[in-house]
């Protein structure tokens, strides 16, 4: 509703540019199912499509625009009004505490075989927790964030390829802009699949990074604080390490959280994210230069 009113205030029809949720007979935007579940319904947006993955730099730039515009339109939303659907979701300090506990408890008896992986992730802990600690010190503001900034959470016009709106709003919570930016980069600019076994294929695609950064910063760059601008590249590194350490934690715990297709699936995922994070660190200066280019 907030975004819809923002769009309408510009004189543009909001019909295809924001999700419209239907109300139930009691006026609420959800319905309780017979088994106690919650359901809601949004209007179908005609002539729209999504992309699970893409190499099209134009689409990637549009994806960046979509999430940047999402940030822009909600920049003055009272963030404290948001309900926290997943507590401590990007609390990287707690993610590493959970990792340490998984190593110590060794529930699945796998710790010895992945000592090298454990050591490499522990070496990245300070990097991964820097932005969270900055936020706790008041150096980075909490804003409205999407928290699942994948390309497939944007609707695009089938004909023009331009973005229409951001979807899948279940995880909208207070968070850091750099984490939304970073998680998108982790997903869209990886040269390989998330569970690629051959880590020699894993790297940060700087062309894709630039395409997304151009779109994102072009929309919301002027609204960012200096610290937010300076940590966009670090956000990509942080989200990649966090994702990887979660995969390795789950592997050590016996694959109890993430759905897996084979015994070492979480380990392959963790190693892939580790390789990507290490390549990002090597290319951090290049990432920062690209960010600065569009600010």
Task: Give residue spans per PLM region.
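Regulatory N- and C-terminal appendages and interdomain linkers associated
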Residues: 8-10, 14, 161-162, 246-295
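Catalytic activation segment of kinase domains across protein kinase-like and atypical kinase folds
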Residues: 138, 152-193
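Conserved ATP-binding subdomain of kinase catalytic cores across diverse folds
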Residues: 1-99, 177, 188, 193-202, ...
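Active-site activation/catalytic loop segments of kinase-like enzymes and analogous catalytic loops
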Residues: 174, 178-222, 238-257
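Charged catalytic carboxylate motif
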Residues: 62, 66, 120, 180, ...
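A short, acidic/glycine-rich surface segment
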Residues: 26-32, 130-132, 248
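Small/polar glycine-rich anion-binding or flexible loop at a beta-alpha turn
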Residues: 229-239
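ATP-dependent phospho-/nucleotidyl transfer catalytic cores
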Residues: 48-63, 76-146, 151-165, 259-261, ...
């Amino acid at each position: 509703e907030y975004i819809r009113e923002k769009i309408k205030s510009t004189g543009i029809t909001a019909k295809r540019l924001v999700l419209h949720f239907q109300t139930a007979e009691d006026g609420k935007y959800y319905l309780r199912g017979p088994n106690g579940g919650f359901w809601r319904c949004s209007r179908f947006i005609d002539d729209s499509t999504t992309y699970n993955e893409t190499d099209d730099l134009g689409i990637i730039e549009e994806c960046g625009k979509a999430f940047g515009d999402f940030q822009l339109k909600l920049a003055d939303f009272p963030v404290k009004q948001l309900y926290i659907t997943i507590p401590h979701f990007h609390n990287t300090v707690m993610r590493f505490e959970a990792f340490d506990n998984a190593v110590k408890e060794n529930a699945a008896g796998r710790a010895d075989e992945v000592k090298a992986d454990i050591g490499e992730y522990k070496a990245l802990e300070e990097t991964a927790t820097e932005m969270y600690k900055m936020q706790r010190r008041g150096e980075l503001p909490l804003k409205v964030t999407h928290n699942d900034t994948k390309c497939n959470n944007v609707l695009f016009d089938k004909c023009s390829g331009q973005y229409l709106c951001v979807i899948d709003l279940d995880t909208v919570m207070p968070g850091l802009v750099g984490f939304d930016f970073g998680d998108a980069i982790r997903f869209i600019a990886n040269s390989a699949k998330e569970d690629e076994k051959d880590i020699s294929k894993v790297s940060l695609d700087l062309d894709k990074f630039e395409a997304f950064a151009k779109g994102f910063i072009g929309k919301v760059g002027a609204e960012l604080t200096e610290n937010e601008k300076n940590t966009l590249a670090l956000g990509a590194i942080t989200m990649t390490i966090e994702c990887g350490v979660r995969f390795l934690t789950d592997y050590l715990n016996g694959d109890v959280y993430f759905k897996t297709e084979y015994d070492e699936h979480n380990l392959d995922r963790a190693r892939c994210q580790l390789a990507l994070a290490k390549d990002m660190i090597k290319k951090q200066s290049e990432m920062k230069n690209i960010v600065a280019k569009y600010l």
